[in-house]
Amino acid sequence: MALGEEKAEAEASEDTKAQSYGRGSCGERELDTPGPMSGEQPPRLEAEGGLTSPVWGAEGIPAPTCWIGTDPGGPSRAHQPQASDASREPVAERSEPALSGLPPATMGSGDLLLSRESQVEKTKLSASEELPQTPSLPRTTTICSGHDADTEDDPSLADLPQAPSSGLSCLSQWKSMPSPGSAAPQPSSCSVSASSTGSSLQGHQERTEPRGGSLAKVSSSLELVVPQEPSSVVGLGPRPQWSPQPVFSGGDASGLGRRRLSFQAEYWACVLPDSLPPSPDRHSPLWNPNKEYEDLLDYTYPLRPGPQLPKHLDSRVPADPVLQDSGVDLDSFSVSPASTLKSPTNVFPNCPPAEATALPLSGPREPSLKQWPSGVPQKQGGMGLASWSQLTSTPRAPGSRDARWECREPALRGAKDWLPIGKPLDMGSPQLRTRDRGWPSPRPEREKRTSQSARRPTCTESRWKSEEEVESDDEYLALPARLTQVSSLVSYIGSISTLVTLPAGDIKGQSPLEVSDTDGPASLPSSSSQSQLPPGAALRGSGDPEGQNPCFLRSFVRAQDSAGEGSLGSSQALGVSSGLLKTRPSLPARLDRWPFSDPDAEGQLPRKGGEQGKESLVQCVKTFCCQLEELICWLYNVADVTDHGTAARSNLTSLKSSLQLYRQFKKDIDEHQSLTESVLQKGEILLQCLLENTPVLEDVLGRIAKQSGELESHADRLYDSILASLDMLAGCTLIPDKKPMAAMERPREGV
């Protein structure tokens, strides 16, 4: 039986040899490996350091070819030998343990010109009658490139046919080492090597040894792992397939297999996609060309190589915010503070939980953030922090959210204490001027605030920090410090200016501001003996010193000091001489005399809780207009009800409905009685105010009309004086009564 198999091998080798000589190429050969038909693990071809792709066809394993005088584009079937499988007989009928692993093959950088040749392999088995089972031994294939090949173990291997082509020799060997006393065969190794001089086969493992001593470094290796299974059916076995998983050898394998790393497989995993490119149905009404283009870009240029998760899972997978890929696929993860700092413990894992709660965007409760002058947190969320100590400071006490307004209360109380209420207000006094600069408080209040400074910093120290004191490298601030200070200053001065009050005695003409109401030549109230309150100041009574009542009416008041001299005023601020214009403050006097509140509110106690004891003129007009509009609408509704109402009938149901309608109507009248009285009262007040101010308004309009003529005459007199001075310099004398022609021709208005 063994002789018959050797004969069949020789015939098949001679046929293959003849075909290879006829074709003139070391072209593609078909590796015919008998194996199981189903149920076993397919062979794997391992590639290290190179591309792995499913390149196996239905015909076998196409190897790289070296074309000599042939057309590369021709069909590959012409270069494949016709292996006769009819002479094969099934020898083993039981299973055999598969080959666990082979030592990795080494491929040197010799004179191998991408030409390899594979011959038909057949199994050479020795029938052992002493074993109950005849295992099929694993085959060993050694593809060598060189000028000659040596065999050292088995002298019968030299008798095997060889197929030389283009100076290359290919050796196909089979080893069968059954021992009569052994129960299991010993598999031989498989190695693919290239050398400049040749190769030698030693023992059960064929190793490549350079004869010239010029073996290059290992560049790539190709390993063919073919598990041996019993074959009961004559024919081709499963085709080897490319597999990206590394295969390691057994106990006595070489060290090259152990040097296989996982990153090599991952390196090529991003190049070879595991799915087909997107090909949507373009005839479908749901086809979106933009979506197809985006999918094609994602398929061609993947940003995250490796296994891709679905979008609904990928958006919830935590990622490293520092080592995140920067690309167009950052919709799921972003390096912005709004998305990466949601969990502060991920960014600062070594921080204690108490400090982690002080991070920006960690939650609504941020007890230890530094405050800008306006109370805005220093960081609105950002990674560019100077140090971790800047994020945390001394924790504030509970209820410290309103600490800013609590800091303002001492200043407000101090201003309330020092402002004079029962005596004339001196707008030009040294105390007021000093208060404008530094806002000092009386001595008791200063001592009180000094005692409070030990347990709570003052509002000025907490809100007035310069830009140099704030240590921060973040360029994105909520508001610039300068603008914040200006806004704080405006609000602070506005709260102080509202404390200027007018007592209730002002209604009776006993104002502490002592407004002059004498008759005489009058002009615009713009002299140096007058002062103008800020536009936001409110004229209020002494009953409400703490409430804020914005006044839109500019009140011109005249304040006299103890010496009877005028102080701060608009004309003095402009540098205009006080004797140039003569004024009479009749308008401010009359405006200050009219009552802004209801007459019944004069004798009441001071109100608290922010209620307004006195109302300004503008607020009174607004209130009157709103109430009048409401009253008119209600009267229209009442007219509609009364017009559509019907008289009561004699039956009981009609009487009940009429009685119910009467009760509702009476109740509605009672509810709107107060509205009616308020409209009447405020209307009378406004009418009285208009009547009192009618002559004042007429006087003001007449003065405005006369001002143009007065200014023109003053300009003419100034021009005459200039001409007189020029004439005196020139030595000419003019008649004193003579006036310039321009002044004579110009009409005099208002004289």
Curated annotation (Swiss-Prot):
The keyword Phosphoprotein applies. Residues 1-253, 339-474, 511-545, 590-611 are annotated as: Disordered. It is found in: Cytoplasm, Cytoskeleton, Microtubule organizing center, Centrosome. Its main location: cytoplasm. GO terms for biological process: centrosome cycle. It comes from the Eukaryota. Residues 131-144, 163-175, 339-348, 451-461 have a biased composition (Polar residues). Keywords: Cytoplasm, Cytoskeleton, Phosphoprotein, Ubl conjugation. The keyword Disulfide bond does not apply. This is Centrosomal protein of 68 kDa. The gene is CEP68.
